[in-house]
Regions:
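Jelly-roll (double-stranded beta-helix
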Residues: 1-205
Length: 205
């Protein structure tokens, strides 16, 4: 229902993204990077785009990355909302235990979102996971190529809009502009305001 709102751009600088560092009873660390969605004990996440599903409290959206030392344990808290869907992607490390289940290879795991889960890095190397969760939007979906709307009529209108204006016009003189070869970290916002950050900024800066 928010597909026709004004576009919005936010740069989430790595060093500004909040993190929770948890040391278990043995002193082994789990670091949770909070890209979106509140995590108990962590600083508040950065603001999502104002009309996104992540900005709606009922969306219960979370995007967290986990890095666990060998042997580390951390309890993933239950999601807030009933009906929230939750996926845990294990993609770096040797082995992971989720509750009573041992996972000996990289995998995508759908977890029951309404309960806590004890996670244990049972491998000999650091482990990394990505957690994605949210409430289903529960609206009709129509899709064609890169266009996603709610009805076929909206798909046709979006295609016509793109053919006519390329969604507002293409302001560059060619189809493949580049930003140059120098190493820079910058963001350019609507109105041409530009923000630049150090290439080696410390986390928390």
């Amino acid at each position: 229902k928010h597909k026709m709102v004004e576009p919005h751009f936010t740069m989430l600088w790595n060093e500004r993204i909040p993190r929770l560092v948890h040391n278990d009873d043995a002193g082994r660390a789990t670091t949770v990077t909070v890209v979106a969605g509140a995590l108990p004990g962590a600083p508040a996440p950065l603001s999502p785009p104002p009309e996104s599903w992540a900005s709606q409290p009922e969306g219960d959206v979370a995007i967290w990355t986990l890095r666990m030392d060998p042997g580390a344990q951390w309890t993933l808290p239950a999601a807030r909302g009933q009906g929230t869907r939750r996926m845990l992607y294990f993609f770096v490390g040797d082995s992971l235990r989720v509750g009573p289940q041992d996972v000996g290879q990289h995998a995508a795991l759908e977890l029951v979102a309404g309960q806590d889960w004890l996670l244990t890095n049972t491998g000999a190397t650091p482990l990394e996971c990505l957690l994605l969760q949210g409430q289903p939007i529960a609206e009709p979906v129509a899709q064609y190529g890169p266009f996603v709307m709610n009805t076929q009529a909206e798909i046709m209108q979006a295609m016509n809009d793109y053919r006519r204006t390329q969604f507002g016009g293409w302001p560059w003189p060619d189809q493949d502009p580049v930003h140059g070869t120098e190493a820079r970290r910058f963001a350019r916002y609507p109105g041409q305001r530009e923000e630049e950050r150090p290439t080696e900024a410390p986390v928390g800066a």
